């Protein structure tokens, strides 16, 4: 495990990582978590309202009690010992793709059409 200073060039770090840990005490949407999944990284995240909403019933992520360092360490150890990474990576990429800008724009476009023209 390594902790790095802030950088805008995160792609290289994602490429050399095996898991992504989001240990926030508060989080808005969690776009960085979606970006990590788009790079095939399974996620260990604080159990926050947004992470619970985004990751419920997802096989490529686990939630730990916010602030519970022992539980976080246990999940990190568990994930480090896993050998079935490929399916988790594929699931992460597949799920992150649902947040692709084109799909989000299409969803908004469809919603706005329903609002403007009524439900058909």
At which residue positions do the language-model features occur?
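Conserved acidic donor-binding segment of nucleotide-sugar-dependent glycosyltransferases
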Residues: 57-58, 62-69, 78-83
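A short, well-ordered alpha-helix in the C-terminal region of glycosyltransferases
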Residues: 84-98, 110
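C-terminal alpha-helical cap of glycosyltransferases
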Residues: 101-120
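Aromatic "clamp/platform" in nucleotide-sugar-dependent glycosyltransferases that forms part
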Residues: 6, 25
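Short glycine/serine-rich donor-binding loops of glycosyltransferases
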Residues: 30-33, 51
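Nucleotide-activated donor-binding/catalytic signature segment of Leloir-type glycosyltransferases, i.e.
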Residues: 1-5
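Short hydrophobic beta-strand element within catalytic cores of glycosyltransferases
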Residues: 42-45
């Amino acid at each position: 495990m390594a902790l790095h200073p802030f950088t805008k060039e995160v792609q290289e770090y994602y490429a050399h990582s095996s898991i992504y840990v989001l240990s926030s005490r508060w989080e808005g949407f969690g776009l960085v978590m979606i970006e990590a999944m788009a790079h095939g990284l399974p996620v260990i995240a604080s159990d926050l309202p947004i992470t619970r909403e985004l990751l419920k019933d997802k096989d490529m992520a686990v939630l730990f009690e916010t602030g519970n360092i022992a539980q976080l360490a246990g999940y990190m150890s568990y994930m480090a010992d896993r050998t079935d990474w490929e399916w988790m990576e594929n699931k992460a990429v597949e799920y992150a793709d649902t947040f692709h800008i084109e799909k989000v724009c299409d969803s908004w476009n469809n919603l706005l059409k329903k609002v403007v023209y009524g439900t058909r």
